[in-house]
Amino acid sequence: MRRILNKESDRFTLYPILYPDVFPFYKKAEACFWTAEEIDYSSDLKDFEKLNENEKHFIKHVLAFFAASDGIVLENLAVSFLREVQITEAKKFYSFQIAVENIHSETYSLLIDNYIKDEKERLNLFHAIENIPAVKNKALWAAKWINDTNSFAERIVANACVEGILFSGSFCAIFWFKKQNKLHGLTFSNELISRDEGLHTDFNCLIYSLLDNKLPEQMVQNIVKEAGGVEVEKSFICESLPCDLIGMNSRLMSQYIEFVADRLLECLGCSKIFHSKNPFNWMDLISLQGKTNFFEKRVADYQKSGVMAQRKDHVFCLNTEF
C-alpha cells in the first residue's frame, strides 16, 4: 500500500511515466469524453408520455437514484481518493473522472427536467435521498464508505461495487427500453454513462491490484455480496423498485446482478461466488466485463479522434499503396 499512498514530492510533472499500467486509463477516459449537450432529447418526451404509469414511475425513480448517486461518487473522489492516492498517473485519472461524473449528473438532471413538468414532483426527485426510501437506502450504503474509519483497501473495493454493481440493474433496465426502441436520448446517454462507469470500475480494480496489503479474499467477497453490493442492488431493483413494473423478470434480473458481481470479483483477483450466467443475451455486449469489453469497443464509435493513437500512427508516409 505504501507505493500508492506515500507522497511523491518530486513528481509535479507527468513524465516520465512511472506506472505504465495506470496511465492508459487516463488516456481512455480522455478519448471517451462527451458532454450533455451532445445528447438528442427531442423525441424522448413523446415516448415518455406514451409509457404506462408503472413504466413512468420506474424511470423517474431510477433517474432520481442516478442523479443522487453521482454526487456521492464525486464526494468520494474529491474527499478521499484524489487526496490519498499519490500516484501522479492515478491523480490524472481521478481528476478527469470528477469532470465526467459532473457530466453524468448534469445529464440525469436534464432528463428529469425534460420528463417531469410538475415542479413539486421534480424537486422531490432532485431530493430523492431525503424523500424516496428506496433511493435513500441505496445511497446510504454507498455514502458510508466515504468514512475514513474503513481501510483504503475496503473503500476501494466498495467503490468498485458502487460503480460496478449498484448501477448494474438500472443500466440493464434502461437498455430494456432501448431494445424496445424507446427513449433514444435516455438510452444513448445510458450507453455512454455505462461505458464510463465500466472504465471507472476497472480502474478501481487496477488500483486495488497495486496494493501491497490486500484484503483476505473472504472479506472482498463479503463486501461484494453480504455487506452491500449484490444484496443492496437486488433489494433496489427487484423489491423496492421492482423491474417487473416494466415487464422484466425479477428472478432473471437477480441472476444478472450475480453475473456482474462474479465478473467484478474476478477483476479484483478473487474467485466467483455465484457462478451465474448472463440471462439476458442482448446484454452480452454491455455487461461490465473486465479486460476486452464493451467499453473498449466504444459506443457508437464514440471516441475523440487520435487520442488513443500511438506516435507511430502519426507518421507521414509517401510510399503507401492505395
Curated annotation (Swiss-Prot):
Q: Give the cofactor note.
A: Binds 2 iron ions per subunit.
| Ligand binding (Fe cation 2) | E101, E163, E197, H200
> Which PROSITE patterns would you find in this protein's record?
RIBORED_SMALL
Q: What class of enzyme is it?
A: oxidoreductase
Gene3D superfamilies documented for this protein: Ribonucleotide Reductase, subunit A (1.10.620.20)
Which key words are in the record? Deoxyribonucleotide synthesis, Iron, Metal-binding, Oxidoreductase
Q: What does this protein do?
A: Provides the precursors necessary for DNA synthesis. Catalyzes the biosynthesis of deoxyribonucleotides from the corresponding ribonucleotides.
Output this protein's name: Ribonucleoside-diphosphate reductase small subunit
- Give the classification, highest ranks: Eukaryota, Sar, Alveolata, Apicomplexa, Aconoidasida
